[in-house]
Amino acid sequence: MQRTTSATHLQPADVEEYFARVPEEARVTLEKLRKTIRAAVPKAVEVIWYQMPTFKLNERPLVCIGAFKNHCSLFPMSGAILKAYKDELEPYYTSKGTIRFPLGKPVPATLVKKVVKARILENEARKKR
């Protein structure tokens, strides 16, 4: 059964359905990002959360990814991480919790892996509190 989040937007049932709906140019870009994240954290589980593919580890969200009309985004869900990598992220549009990049030009794999690993450390630190 399809879940709806509003009258006009159907939430994808799973990550594969999300990718099937994405236009090809964005899908290719997002698949590269997805592959990099999987390599950085192979034990992560992919789910749909807030209508986007989300990588979770130990039931805690690490990062979300999304495709939009003219760009793709990586959502580290952490302003602290964006500040920590501010210099490396300078070529990209960033906001409070988003790294936006053009279609066909994903964020370098080494930087994505740093962000993901930093999110793992953040989640582990929160768990200890």
Q: What is each stretch, according to the model?
A:
Residues M1-R129:
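Charge-dense, helix-prone N-terminal extensions
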